[in-house]
Design a protein with these regions (language model features):
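C-terminal motif of bacterial Sec signal peptides marking the signal peptidase cleavage site
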Residues: 19-22
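N-terminal capping segment at the start of a domain
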Residues: 35-73, 98, 108, 274, ...
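Noncatalytic luminal/extracellular "stalk/propeptide" segments of secretory-pathway proteins
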Residues: 52-55, 59-163
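Extracellular/luminal Protease-associated
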Residues: 72, 120-220, 280, 384
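Soluble metallo-hydrolase cores and metallopeptidase-like ectodomains found primarily
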Residues: 124-153, 210-282, 294-297, 301, ...
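Short helix-loop-beta-strand segments that form the rim/entrance of peptidase-like active sites
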Residues: 211-213, 296-321, 344, 471
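Metal-dependent peptidase/peptidase-like ectodomains
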Residues: 262-264, 277, 303, 313-417, ...
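His/Asp/Glu-rich mid-to-C-terminal helical/loop segments that flank catalytic regions of hydrolases
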Residues: 415-473
Length: 473
């Protein structure tokens, strides 16, 4: 997931509610939604119910090379686990497939500076998802450092670029794909994006969304490697890059499960099931599917009248591919049938901030969902922040289809402020999830109480929409 600016709201300690109570916020135009609404919870979801699902996904990763990446055996085993759980609960389950480009970086990649150190893939850099292979030597030309907010996102950042050199850029405000396309157009033979905040062993692997048009190596580098390349640019040293990647095609599955309720419209809840190339993906995003499975269990046992659809997406880490394929395949009637889509991605960050999606320009009804979730969490002792997640997770295509959307999130690489540490505990000055997209994203680091609290909030808003207490367009 990408990092976004957060809007602060005071908070307090976390609790798990037995009664789900919520009220819409003062901006709600619906008088009935602005009145206090009390929903009798069929049962509270506890962290002890969440943990077995996380352990099952961790075991799947361990049995499959430490990964659950879409297009791998680890991901398909995750699909089988989720589908079996839902069938045992009595849901109608489908596993529709979609085709996607797969990606793998082969071991042994290096970046060397003439007369200087050699840096290795994994520890010092990673080839971004859909990077091309390459074995080349060239000088370095820095771009975008005069305006770090742009960071190569604008074609004008490459004015005066020396064709045939390696482009070195800071992290900008756009998707990395745009920077790569600008670099290719300017004649770069490779692109290295330097992340000053990443130390040795910590580089992440952003996605370039598609291999189309990407014919140069594209690397995500630590601050140390970035500094070495800056020095090489200043003294004119040659830099050698050797990296090998494999790009293929695979049929990958989503999991779609629906209850047998009789309402005309369906409430849809989802979260991505795939992990990254560099770890087991337990908080990101085993936590969302684990919460969804327990919500599904409660609804199946206690509220069989509710018409609810659950989605477990593949290919999110490559660029929201599974959810995009699903929404693209919906006819107009199928889109109109969905009363709301609720997204759950990264619910248990250890240095968390509780966050409610609140996106300007989202479909009518989205603000009511956000107000409801905020009011629910406040009622159980958590005052969440609101965030515009943009295109950072699987709600994006539902938002684009003008379906009301909402969701919950607990933070990724965003740095916790002093005010947030005062409000929620944890450590100021550190990432909300220091193991985001790394091998250390394991069960032991997940905040189970937070996942459970979020699951109860999701259950509350689902029942409110399904039962008509929260009216949406």
């Amino acid at each position: 997931m990408r990092s976004f600016r957060l809007t602060a709201t005071p908070g307090s300690t976390l609790a798990i509610a037995i009664v789900l109570a919520a009220c819409a916020g003062p901006t709600s135009p619906n008088p009935s939604a602005s009145a206090a609404q009390s929903i009798d919870a069929p049962q509270a979801i506890a962290g002890t119910a969440i943990r077995p699902h996380l352990e099952a996904l961790m075991e799947i990763a361990t049995d499959n090379g430490g990964l659950r990446t879409a297009g791998t055996a680890g991901y398909e085993a995750s699909v089988q686990y989720v589908a079996e759980q839902l069938r045992e609960m009595g849901y109608s389950v489908e596993v529709p497939e979609f085709e996607m480009a797969t990606y793998l970086e082969l071991p042994g990649g290096t970046v060397g500076v003439d007369g200087g150190p050699t840096f290795e893939t994994g520890d010092d850099f990673k080839a971004m998802i859909y990077s091309a292979s390459g074995d080349l030597s060239a000088a370095v030309t820095p771009v975008g450092f005069a305006n770090n907010e742009s960071g190569g996102c604008a074609a004008t950042d490459f004015d005066g670029f020396v064709e045939g050199t390696i482009a070195l850029a800071p992290p900008g405000s756009c998707f990395r794909r745009q920077v790569v396309l600008n670099a290719v157009a300017a004649g770069a033979v490779a692109l290295v994006v330097s992340y000053p905040q990443y130390a040795k062993g910590e580089p992440r692997r952003p996605t370039l969304l598609s291999p189309d048009g990407i014919d140069i190596p594209v690397l995500s580098a630590t601050g140390e490697l970035g500094d070495a390349l800056q020095a090489a640019a200043e003294d004119g040293s040659q830099v050698h890059i050797s990296v090998a990647t494999q790009i293929g095609q695979a049929m990958v599955h989503n999991v779609i499960a629906e209850s047998h309720g009789i309402a005309e419209r369906v409430v849809m809840l989802g979260g991505h099931l795939d992990g990254v190339h560099d770890g087991p993906g337990i908080n990101d995003n085993g936590s969302g599917p684990a919460a969804l499975l327990e919500i599904a269990r409660v609804l199946a046992e206690e509220r069989p009248w509710a018409r609810v659809r659950f989605a477990f997406w593949g290919g999110e880490e490559f660029g929201l591919l599974g959810s995009g394929a699903y929404v693209d395949g919906l006819e107009a009637d199928g889109r109109a049938e969905i009363a709301a889509y609720l997204n759950f991605d990264m619910l248990g960050s250890p240095n968390y901030v509780p966050i409610v999606y609140d996106e300007p320009g989202a479909a009518a009804g989205s603000s009511k969902i956000a107000d409801f979730l905020v009011a629910y969490l406040e009622s159980v002792g958590v005052a969440p922040e609101r965030m515009d997640l943009g295109g950072g997770s699987d709600h994006y295509f539902f938002t684009e289809a003008r379906i009301p959307t909402g969701g919950l999130f607990s933070g990724a690489t965003e740095i916790k402020t002093d005010a947030q540490a005062d409000a929620y505990g944890g450590t100021a000055g550190e990432a909300m999830d220091a193991c985001y997209h790394l091998a250390c994203d394991t069960v032991e680091r997940v905040n189970l109480d937070l996942v459970a609290s979020f699951a109860n909030a999701a259950l509350a808003v689902t029942l409110a929409i399904a039962g008509g207490e929260l009216e949406l367009p």
